[in-house]
Amino acid sequence: MAEEDYLPVYQLRRDSSLLGTMNKILVANRGEIPIRIFRTAHELSMNTVAIYSHEDRLSMHRLKADEAYVIGERGQYSPVQAYLAIDEIIKIAVKHNVNMIHPGYGFCSENSEFARKVEENGILWVGPSDTVIDAVGDKVSARNLAYAANVPTVPGTPGPIEDVAQATAFVEEYGYPVIIKAAFGGGGRGMRVVREGDDIEDAFLRASSEAKTAFGNGTVFIERFLDKPKHIEVQLLADNYGNVIHLFERDCSVQRRHQKVARNCSAKTLPVEVRNAILNDAVKLAKTANYRNAGTAEFLVDSQNRHYFIEINPRIQVEHTITEEITGVDIVAAQIQIAAGASLEQLGLLQEKITTRGFAIQCRITTEDPTKNFQPDTGKIEVYRSSGGNGVRLDGGNGFAGAVISPHYDSMLVKCSTSGSNYEIRRRKMIRALVEFRIRGVKTNIPFLLALLTHPVFMTSECWTTFIDDTPELFKILTSQNRAQKLLAYLGDLAVNGSSIKGQIGLPKLHKEADIPSITDINGDVIDVSIPPPDGWRQFLLEKGPEQFAQQVRAFPGLMIMDTTWRDAHQSLLATRVRTHDLLNIAPATSYALHHAFALECWGGATFDVSMRFLHEDPWQRLRKLRKAVPNIPFSMLLRGGNGVAYYSLPDNAIDHFLKQAKDTGVDVFRVFDALNDIEQLKVGVDAVKKAGGVVEATMCYSGDMLKPGKKYNLEYYINLATEIVEMGTHILAVKDMAGTLKPTAAKQLISALRRKFPSLPIHVHTHDSAGTGVASMVACARAGADVVTVRVNSMSGMTSQPSMSAFIASLDGEIETGIPEANAREIDAYWAEMRLLYSCFEADLKGPDPEVYQHEIPGGQLTNLLFQAQQVGLGEKWVETKKAYEAANRLLGDIVKVTPTSKVVGDLAQFMVSNKLSSEDVERLASELDFPDSVLDFFEGLMGTPYGGFPEPLRTNVISGKRRKLTSRPGLTLEPYNIPAIREDLEARFSKVTENDVASYNMYPKVYEAYKKQQELYGDLSVLPTRNFLSPPKIDEERHVTIVTIETRKTLIIKCMAEGELSQSSGTREVYFELNGEMRKVTVEDKNGAVETITRPKADAHNPNEIGAPMAGVVVEVRVHENGEVKKGDPIAVLSAMKMEMVISSPVAGRIGQIAVKENDSVDASDLIPKSSRLSKLLMFIILIILY
């Protein structure tokens, strides 16, 4: 040969001398492989032509070519058929003077007719000849080729099988298991493994049908199935002159349903002699077939290292990239130049010169959801950030932000290949590369790939072809958190629709981050609160246990305080809306300022469900974070006895389970009460706390004014109740004055009597300052012998809240020591003063003390919520009337102890009376006919326990007659224990990352928990958002409105809202654009006000008993009847939701439903027509199912 024939490859490419006039190439494919081929073609100075279907008009491969042409007319071909339309493709090639056609892989790459027609039209086919494709592309023909080359094959049918009878005959001779395979094509399509006779017919039909759909040919054959073999394939290159070389082998054993998932190069565990035998057989097969161009010979290796030839793929393979990485050979360049007539020698591709260097691995990143059996996901890619760096190669297709992933084509986004000097290095590179990817908007298989790459079997390269199917633990996947994009989705919704937080009126008045105050020591020097705080009472408790802790509290020479700012304060003043973010900000300072405090009340009660229901936070995560931030002060929680933190009785084992989780997560002191002071209900909670190992603070609820003559809750009652509690066993005795009706004189008498009766028992008193006498009452308690009182920081005190900490400390100055420097109390109060501005949109707007509390006795925590609720359901103008009705309702119920949930019974009955204009006499007279609120029925049934003095009769009997039973024992005894393992299993099937905390949450509030998890799926962890950004819509393109979010330590997001798009008339959505850490991102948001249809609803005629109207404004949750349906007395008709209440509208008499004027999710106003009945004759009342928060 001439000297120029031995020029290096890069010089040949540069002058393209081997290509001659072959300067224009068309790739008859789509997605990633055309782009790969175009890149090499450009390096060879060639012009490139892409083809595309109408559905692919936005695909990246169209843009990467010099020219691009659509296949046929719109609608002429289906999305897949377009790439199988060989005549149309050739017509495009001829029309535009194409010299070469490269088929890529898939579609027509193994279609001999296509190859033949291409060459008949004078165009070079980049691949083996049509006769070779016929000889090796058909797996049956390939088997015959193997016989001719004396290469071992798996026993199978000598030719294609036509029907089930032939398949059955084969298995009768060779036995099971067998595999039915498509004769044409690959990729796992048209394959079925059959292990027993009953499945053979279905497997044959499905394999044939699938092959027909995928490859246009339903021919199949059958062979013995090797159990747990390795899949080894050899990369071949052959020129037009009979020369064949191999580029070594690839281990493609990691498959799912016969489709390769991860490809390794080379095969690490293959013995040398087996490798050489396979390589030699591959070359022998190619020479026997007179093969040309690139191809792959595939083999199976059984457990005895015997290899069997299975097929030759007469095309380039998906995984060719890793062979290129370890050999340095550009296989596509070799294909093109061989097609143009170059020899392997001219290309410098001589077998003895080809070596491998290191190892490589390839993973296909697809839009498949591994948690749903790899179901392909579709949609628009919102974010696409790829990997890179040393040893990483990416071959991409439609992986870019804005790409629409359709269901028509393969779900691959990009092929990621990594290489390294050894097997472990390239594995670690792949893990790193996959972790760097950020793909949002569609599900991907990246989490599964990471699980695979870290599995011990994969790490040793001992996998077999069914490894994935045989290894279920691979599917215990840690899915991507997608935190940033989910936060943008929330902020986008906030920008378009405004805040959706219930109860918010207006926007926060604080327009900056709150200042964190400095804490000073006794010398006035600033303390560094970033270092661990000094030991507090919690260290003593952890070391000595509850018993000695209680003794030490009693022995304390002064008075201890519990601060309720973190729970009861914001429940009483701010609708329980203070977020974890703001508690954590002040936590380090608090751990210093109040390190001598008895406890911080920060959990339980209404904060538990409100965290999930309205703040979209996990209450357990709040507890964990606060516990970490404040390790030195005991945490206290409020526990509703046999209800846990729910508003209804639960099985005892659910209470036990919940309290174990609470104790393990960080609660120390459990303030246990029962809403009726029912000792049996109280005992459930007390016993559960003892089992959990917590400090028991058994609590008796103070109600009314014990100084008032004739009051049934007098001093004797409380002393007797306390005696029962002490006999039951408690570490601390607590008094809970929830309405603030414990006057100073009564406080002195009660605490003095308790101290005389129980001289060694610590006493803790809790009150509300509704009447303005809270500080005086707590001072009286201190002087009478109380050990602990409840106060809160000044800015969060007063009115329905607890007394002021500073005022209380000052009142005892020089008399009783609290251990809390008043200066420190003032320092942390500065922060909470700003919090009142930040949460001003939840203020109840109370102007001052309300001495009327001594008459209506509404608990402090309920007063603001009841006012807010009344406003939401249209009774705001009747607030004075509602308070009077509260007094009347309490008398009707027998003057009960009023604390959640019994206080809600009184409140619901009061609103029911006001809404329906009922007096006390009306209620008593019509009790058997009225549909009372469900909470009232629960009370009279006995589900809340038994009130002191019993139930009022005959009212109880009349109310529940025909509707409820009368319980005579503790409610929990009537409930079946929860199957907690089964509940966890159910939650794990529905939600990700389920813990015992989640199970406990679900047990307390099933619907609330489910709604919270769904919200979390949409928006992620919203607790990381600063509160002003959580409540206020972002402003467009203003530097001062940048949102800075710390999602974890040392990981910060800087978010800026850039623009809001126009309303889409077709979808009712808007696109909102953000700058996230300097990178543009977009979210699509439904505009809930953009296409609102104005609906004027008919009103029910109050004088027509056949027309049933809504009692107050709300949303239709459910319609339970249909038109012309018959109803019996008491049958539910519809369910309405109005803030805290759900109203089940039921029929008081039998009748037939006529027109139904509403549907689910409709908003209705008071008196809006719900159904019209043809035969209802009595006034319809309403059952109110209380959903509390």
Curated annotation (Swiss-Prot):
Q: What is its EC number?
A: 6.4.1.1
The biological process GO terms on file are: gluconeogenesis
Source domain of life: Eukaryota
Q: Which residues carry this modification: N6-biotinyllysine?
A: 1140
Q: Which residues carry this modification: N6-carboxylysine?
A: 736
**Positions that bind ATP:** 139, 223, 258
Binding positions for substrate per the UniProt entry: 567-571, 640, 900
**Pfam families for the chain:** Biotin_carb_C, Biotin_carb_N, Biotin_lipoyl, CPSase_L_D2, HMGL-like, PYC_OADA
Name of the protein: Pyruvate carboxylase
This chain's source organism reads Komagataella pastoris
